[in-house]
């Protein structure tokens, strides 16, 4: 993969509540602060990323009588699905997100697109590969001129193994798994190892049939090969021991993080064993446990970030929300936490830049 090629990364865990949206948004913002041009794709019908970034503007981009497709991802996908003229691509920018970050906003209509996808008639026959690789086509249109390509595309996904997740993974170069400090995360990491090889095998079956019928068409040759790039530990707590100068992760979260690391090790072994046709895990991985970085529990900072449509790193530049009618001031501890989280996201961005090449 050439260094100037757009890197497409899905942020995925089939478990909910692991901060996929927050990580997608803030990692994209951190990559932009490193000078990278970033496209975020909200591919979750719940539209949390779009609402977080756009705030009060989000309802205005949804379909209306006058504009039946709106200016969300629906404008592209529905025209494609119904073969209705040229596909239209719209991008948006958040109120306070770095201006090198663009967003393709979500729409609840994504549920309709998901229902239109059939593994049997579209994928396994090879007749509907375009439907399952539509994200790749969307990115190609978003990139436009060769000189103006995105460095990174981050895709926010729903917490399931549904067809939307398949579609995103088939067009992704890498995927990153956010995890939280609970026993279910370790279990769900294992499920990825059981499910992803089947997804890849079914894509390969469809491609083989497509290539048999279209021997000179290599359109899909580089798709369907997502590589596990690592995991992010999110939401743990720290304490400062009396005899120590710095905070340490609390024992319970440390133990849980270790269990997740064990689950990730098994995931890597499973992927390498069951996917032989291409590399399935990062060869130039950041650590033995594929650990990309940690994000301490953000507590009320997350609520303020969502209410103010502001990435964590910029919260110290605006007043916090005490309630919907009153503004307060950040406490010294909160300002320290914002600074630390900013550093954490930049560190993860640096590892992504170094290893996802």
List PLM regions with ranges.
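P-loop NTP-binding core
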Residues: 1-357
């Amino acid at each position: 993969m050439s260094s100037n090629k757009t890197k497409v990364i899905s942020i995925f865990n089939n478990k909910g509540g692991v901060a996929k949206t927050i990580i997608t948004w803030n990692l994209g913002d951190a990559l932009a602060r490193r000078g990278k041009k970033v496209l975020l794709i909200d591919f979750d019908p719940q539209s949390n990323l779009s609402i977080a970034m756009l705030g009060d503007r989000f309802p205005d981009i949804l379909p209306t009588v006058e504009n039946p497709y709106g200016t969300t991802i629906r404008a592209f996908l529905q025209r494609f699905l119904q073969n209705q003229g040229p596909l239209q691509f719209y991008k948006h920018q958040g109120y306070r997100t770095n201006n090198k970050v663009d967003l393709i906003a979500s729409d609840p209509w994504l549920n309709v697109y998901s229902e239109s996808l059939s593994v049997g008639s579209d994928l396994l026959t090879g007749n509907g590969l375009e439907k399952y690789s539509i994200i790749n086509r969307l990115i190609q249109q978003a990139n436009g001129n060769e000189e103006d390509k995105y460095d990174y595309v981050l895709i926010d996904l729903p917490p399931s193994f549904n067809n939307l997740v398949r579609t995103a993974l088939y067009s992704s170069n890498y995927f990153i798994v956010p995890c939280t400090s609970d026993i279910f995360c370790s279990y769900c990491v294992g499920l990825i190892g059981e499910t992803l090889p089947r997804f890849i095998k079914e894509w390969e079956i469809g491609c083989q049939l497509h290539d048999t019928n279209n021997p000179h068409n290599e359109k899909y040759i580089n798709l369907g090969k997502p590589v596990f790039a690592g995991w992010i530990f999110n939401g743990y707590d720290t304490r400062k021991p009396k005899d120590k100068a710095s905070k340490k992760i609390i024992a319970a979260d440390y133990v849980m993080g270790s269990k997740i690391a064990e689950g990730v090790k098994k995931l890597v072994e499973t992927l390498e064993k069951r996917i032989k046709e291409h590399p399935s895990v990062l060869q130039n991985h950041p650590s033995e446990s594929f650990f990309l970085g940690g994000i301490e529990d953000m507590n009320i900072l997350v609520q303020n970030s969502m209410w103010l449509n502001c990435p964590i790193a910029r919260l110290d530049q605006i007043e916090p929300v005490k309630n919907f009618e009153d503004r307060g001031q950040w406490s010294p501890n909160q300002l320290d936490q914002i600074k630390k989280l900013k550093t954490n996201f930049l560190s993860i961005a640096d590892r992504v830049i170094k290893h996802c090449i």
